[in-house]
């Protein structure tokens, strides 16, 4: 998979997972796709991309540490709500269905959690982890809502 549109900090995270953590290329690619979607959502939600922009067309190349430093738990909850209610399951389907499965949403939460843990604990680029207080019971409660 081509990570050329990913900011350096995300590429560093992906390399860390593949080389140090020993995750498969498929797992690392999935982390990239999940985090790319999250960052695109944040740019749209913060008004940093035109409201008319398709989520899949928003560039994340300009995402930097200051952008990530501003991430809040509330934004993560908004992203989870988007996944649960508004994200199209199969974009090419004749009649689109909305809302990703609980397992897809859980995987995205795991990717976000891992990314911010990396930024705070391993890379030491952030002092505080904005998703640290997103405990598993909270995530299950959010994921269970439809």
Locate each region found by the language model.
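An acidic intrinsically disordered interaction segment
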Residues: 1-2, 68
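Onset of an N-terminal alpha helix
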Residues: 3-10, 28
């Amino acid at each position: 998979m081509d990570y050329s549109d990913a900011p350096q900090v995300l590429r560093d995270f992906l390399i860390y997972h593949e080389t140090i953590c020993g995750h498969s290329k498929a797992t690392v690619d999935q982390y990239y796709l999940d985090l790319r979607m999250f960052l695109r959502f944040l740019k749209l939600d913060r008004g940093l991309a035109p409201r008319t922009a398709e989520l899949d067309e928003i560039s994340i190349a300009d995402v930097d540490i200051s952008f990530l430093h501003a991430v809040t738990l509330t934004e993560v909850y908004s992203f989870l709500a988007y996944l649960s209610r508004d994200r199209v399951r199969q974009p090419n389907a004749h009649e689109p269905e909305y809302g990703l499965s609980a397992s897809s949403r859980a995987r995205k939460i795991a990717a976000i959690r891992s990314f911010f843990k990396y930024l705070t604990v391993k890379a030491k680029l952030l002092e505080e982890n904005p998703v640290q207080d997103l405990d598993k019971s909270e995530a299950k409660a959010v994921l269970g809502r439809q």
